[in-house]
Amino acid sequence: MKDFSRLGIRVKDGVMTLNGRPYHGVGVNFFPALSLCLDRVVYGDTRTDVEDYIRKLSEAGIPCMRVMFGVFYGEYVHLWAEKEKRAKYHEACDLLVSLAEKYRIGIIASLFWNVNAFCDYVGDQLDLIADPESRSTKLRLEYVSDIVGRYRFSPAIWAWEIGNELNLACEMTDTGFTTSKGERTPFLTEYLTGYYMIIGRAVREIDPYRMLTGGDAAPRTNSMALYRSRGTVTEPENSREDNRAALTWYTPAPLDTVSVHYPELRLMKEYSELAKELKIALYVGEFHGKLFVNPLDALSPDESPEEKAEQDSWNEMLDTYMKCGIGLVTQWCYGSYSQGRNVDPASLELGADGGIVQNLYIRDGINRANSFYQKNGMADTAAYWSDNL
């Protein structure tokens, strides 16, 4: 079998490497990239040129993109699950991966962005995600076998991610969650941990090398109080040891990287230290500044207090991540999408309007960070692509 052990980001003792060398980088979320490919291949929709989007990302110096590598709603799972339709689904995935290879942009592939999709498709309740014998689990394992097996040899796949912010559902009492036994209880952390172990092991059976993360948000600052009370007590705020426990909940073996979206900056140093103690990598999968609609930075910070606040908050975030030595960060978001089939090419942050980056300070800030990493031997992406394409 072809050796793919040097492809993508690897994590050892909490350190990210690319092509055998320590790696640090700042990329973007391109949430709808596969959705746009499915629109084109399955539905014949040519309103949006996905290649143009990816080409402009490359021209903007973006090294990688976090992508929903699946479908969002259960009503679209049939595009892959029904065998007679799978060839078209593969064609759309092939298109995305080939474009990433062509323009030398790595993919953080989020396999099950919306955990409900496969449950809704087969009629399972959400607690059954931790049951290895449930119908939805078996279907997910088939998806892992198919997709991870198909693309493990591509240098465009930099990391596998299981989902998106599932931890925010844990111990919440206001979600209307009902178990498969008809019990009205919160969705529990133990379901999340069990689910990650099942999917993580399936990924590792096929790809023992690439970075593997759950895709979570930063822990709720009272997650331990919620955990101990099953959602009935909201105080006190987490201690350092409580945060350490939370990071372990969200990164059970064989996962090697903990994801934190929108972390409070006052806790970043602590999260970084805890990750090092646990020998896991830390990935800030989503962040953005204060939202202010100002396409192409038409108003300067001197002209607009709102623009100044947005730029100041964004730069403070990125500076904090860099000072804490975070290996990988991805800005939210390049291009937006209704999560159905309506293309909306406008975005409030690093968005696209016909492929034009709206907030230029974000592009420039990302380039500044990546240039720093490259100059200091922390991001030799050019060598990676030349060695592996």
Which functions belong to the PLM regions below?
Residues 2-255, 261-271, 277-280, 287, ...:
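Active-site mouth of glycoside hydrolases
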Residues 380, 387-388:
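Fungal extracellular Ser/Thr-rich, low-complexity intrinsically disordered regions
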